[in-house]
Amino acid sequence: MNTRPTDKLAIAIAQLNSTVGDIAGNAEKARRARADAAHADLVVFPELFIAGYPPEDLVLKPAFQAGCRSAIETLARETASPGPALLVGTPWLDNGRLYNAVALLDGGDVSALRYKVDLPNYGVFDEKRVFASGPMPGPVNFRGVRLGIPICEDIWGAE
C-alpha cells in the first residue's frame, strides 16, 4: 500500500475484458493488473468486472452472488500487501437487495461500497429488473483525496 501524504493519486485504468460467469478468472485478471500497476495508488476496473458484463439473470442466483462476494473479499484481503488499492465492479447483496456496485479495496478491507443509482432499461440493458437502485453516494476519502465513484450512467446527467 502506498501511503505517501499527497493530494495527488496515480491511477491505473484496467481496461480489461471480463468473462461473464468466470468469477475466478476475472479475479485472477484483477490480481495480474494489480501486479502490473504496482507503481499506482489505485487500479480501476470496469463495471461489474468480477461477474462479467452483462451478467443478466446469472446475478439472481444466490451461489453466484456469494461467489462474487467471496472473490471481492479475497481480493480485499490481498490489498493488505504492498501495492495499489483496487476499485472493482461487482454485484453486491445488502439487506436483501441486490446492487450493481463498485467496491474500493484497500488496506486488506472493503473500505467503501457505492451502488449504481441510474439503472438503464433499454436495448440489451435490463438492470432495473435485476438490481435495486442505490442512494446518491457522496465522495469517499481515499489516501487523503476525496473521490467521487459514480458507475456508468450515474455520471451522464447533471444531477
Predicted stretch roles:
Residues M1-E159:
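Enzyme catalytic cores with a strong preference for nitrogen-chemistry domains
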